[in-house]
From Swiss-Prot:
InterPro entries: DHquinase_II, DHquinase_II_CS, DHquinase_II_sf. The record marks 26 as: Transition state stabilizer. Its EC number is 4.2.1.10. It catalyses: 3-dehydroquinate = 3-dehydroshikimate + H2O. The active site is at residues 31, 109. It comes from the Bacteria. Belongs to the type-II 3-dehydroquinase family. GO terms for biological process: amino acid biosynthetic process; aromatic amino acid family biosynthetic process; chorismate biosynthetic process; quinate catabolic process. The gene is aroQ. This is 3-dehydroquinate dehydratase. Pathway: Metabolic intermediate biosynthesis; chorismate biosynthesis; chorismate from D-erythrose 4-phosphate and phosphoenolpyruvate: step 3/7. Homododecamer. PANTHER family: CATABOLIC 3-DEHYDROQUINASE (PTHR21272:SF3).
Amino acid sequence: MPRTRTLANAPIMILNGPNLNLLGQRQPEIYGSDTLADVEALCAKAAAAHGGTVDFRQSNHEGELVDWIHEARLHHVGIVINPAAYSHTSVAILDALNTCDGLPVVEVHISNIHQREEFRHHSYVSLRADGVIAGCGVQGYAFAVERVAALAETGRADA
């Protein structure tokens, strides 16, 4: 059955993992001074440029993120996810994302995870993501929204 969700009738789910509620306060030398509210405004502006909206959420709890992914597969046009530390540990989040057949998923990281500690170099989420954006600061979220919008509009990976 073809997907009937479009940017005009379904939001992009933006999911933020643990400790991102402290964005702007925690390690500003790595993550910058922008707050999560600033990131939400940036994402909303990027989606609006494509006639879309965002459903922006943050949780420090893996199970809640999994529940939201399950919700997104039914009611959203795509997912932008910053799984934060769960990138490197959560098979549960990967498994949830793998249930989202045909739904564009873009992983975003504020810092370049490949320039950080060795344990941060691997991401389980990347195994499902249609794209990964890292090291672009909070602007990476806007890039991720742009990519999800392009994939949602065309349904093509080369969009």
